[in-house]
């Protein structure tokens, strides 16, 4: 019946709220927003040492575990992270970077978070540009400096084409400079 279904949904929500007691407010906000906005995928973003954006998509049901444990991936496939002999790596989402992606239309959206790259024992990867930046900011702070840093995400727009063997045609002739 409808009332028993509603009771089960409320029990599930209460159980989740009890578990959220151990989470920080940013994790709680991300989980609540994913549920309220009917987000279907969360993209976990990180970069290689060359600054190339990498993305792993997870379902909302996987987000809580990703906050707690991270998500494993093959680090040897990412430029500059590891050698093949030490390929297991973990991405752990930073809930302070949670954002609904605005270009995904329709009732169900997609969100993204930037991630830290960790070794299997939970230590920051020395090949993670985000970790290198955090170290540099920490050293600068020790010397009395404060920096404000944000990612610069760039893209190009091309005309739609059905034949992918052709060279892409830019939408405009504007240049970078």
What are these model-derived regions, one by one?
Residues 1-22:
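Short, Lys/Arg-enriched N-terminal segments with co-localized hydrophobic residues
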Residues 20-177:
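Glycine-rich, acidic/polar active-site loops that bind/position phosphate-bearing ligands
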């Amino acid at each position: 019946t409808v009332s028993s279904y509603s009771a089960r949904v409320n029990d599930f929500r209460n159980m989740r709220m009890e578990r959220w007691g151990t989470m920080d407010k940013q994790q709680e906000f991300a989980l609540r927003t994913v549920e309220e906005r009917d987000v279907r995928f969360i993209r976990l973003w990180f970069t290689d040492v060359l600054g190339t954006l990498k993305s792993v998509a997870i379902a909302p049901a996987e987000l809580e575990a990703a906050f707690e444990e991270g998500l494993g991936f093959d680090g040897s496939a990412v430029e500059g992270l590891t050698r093949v002999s030490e390929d297991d790596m973990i991405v752990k989402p930073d809930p302070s970077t949670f954002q609904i992606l605005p270009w995904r239309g329709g009732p169900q959206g997609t969100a993204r978070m930037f991630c830290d790259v960790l070794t299997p024992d939970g230590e920051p990867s020395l090949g993670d540009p985000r970790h290198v930046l955090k170290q540099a900011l920490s050293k600068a702070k020790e010397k009395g400096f404060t920096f404000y840093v944000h990612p610069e995400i760039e893209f190009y727009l091309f005309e739609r084409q059905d034949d992918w063997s052709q060279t892409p045609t830019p939408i405009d002739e504007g240049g970078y400079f």
